[in-house]
Amino acid sequence: RSSEIEYVVSTPEKQEERHEGLKRILARLPLASPLDGYRIVSDFGKRIDPINGRLAMHEGVDLTSEPGASVLATAPGVVVFAGWNGTYGKMVEIDHGMGVRTRYAHLNSIVVEPGRKVAARTEVGIIGSTGRSTGTHVHYEVLVEDQHYDPVKFIKAGEYVFSKN
């Protein structure tokens, strides 16, 4: 009850402080697409695996664009992996803090190295088809506390939060 009263009578400075804190958190979340101009070719969730024909969980979203398109970090963070990762092929993983990580897989080439701090929209690689892949795309994953979430929901949230309307 007293917290409600404190909130109601909080000073403009406290409200501004809360607002700035929220802006800092939003700025660290992956609320953008890793490609400028993209088409979804395979959604997040259960699907028929295009290689073996069996029902399987697809823990990311596959996005395609023009050949040679840059793959961009969707939020600031630190590159924790950049290299070959089995069925993912050439892959980059970024830790954004707060338990949030993103993965960018099947890249044709990688232009960052582990330990590098990256800003949002920093190029991390070039779209490709390495590893277990059936065509040129980026397989994009969002993990929160090691749980996979639908990346499209993050992209759409960013479009909503940062829209000018």
Predicted segment positions?
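Non-catalytic extracellular/periplasmic "stalk"
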Residues: 1-39, 43
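Catalytic cores of peptidoglycan-degrading enzymes
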Residues: 27-165
